[in-house]
Amino acid sequence: VALPKVALLSAVETVTARITSTLDAAALCKMAQRGQITGAILDGPLAFDNAISAEAARIKGITSEVSGDADILVLPDLESGNVAAKLLEYLAGAASCGVVLGARVPIALTSRADGAASRVASPPRAAAVPPPTLEAAPSAQVRPRTRFRP
């Protein structure tokens, strides 16, 4: 896929301050709109149903290049990602390859119950992920966290 369609998932498809993942998705979409994130078409927040079903998106009135045709699903956190991966594997027969993004380097992540194919495929897949690039103003760069000391 030359330009993958990325669905930034949340429980709902509208931005609300009460659900952090909707704010995160909106911020990522804004960054993509400004050219700070390139190489993909991002949209979100999207609920799972309208990320994978054009009919669900149509019923909910969502018009998007991504809805119903997502190539990549980005889950809001590790817990929901783990649950989604296991649901897809056990109920839909999906093959898995575990990679955690967001750290300084990609992390290969396998389950104790994973078969040999997943265990063999995950490390090279993690190694193939390019390092993160974020074109931000100097004032917006991430600084190392310091511990709070009372």
Give the ranges of each region predicted by the language model.
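Buried hydrophobic positions in well-ordered alpha/beta secondary-structure cores of metabolic enzymes
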Residues: 8-9, 74, 122
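Short, solvent-exposed amphipathic alpha-helical segments in soluble enzyme
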Residues: 22-29, 88-93, 123-128
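A C-terminal functional module that forms or caps the active site or interfaces directly
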Residues: 56-103
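N-terminal charge/polar-biased segments
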Residues: 112-150
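Active-site rim loops that border cofactor/substrate pockets in soluble metabolic enzymes
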Residues: 11-17, 21-71
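Flexible, glycine/charged-enriched surface loops at secondary-structure junctions
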Residues: 1-6, 35-45, 132-145
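Short, flexible loop segments at boundaries between secondary-structure elements
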Residues: 45-47, 100-115
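Internal alpha/beta core interface subdomains
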Residues: 1-12, 26, 106
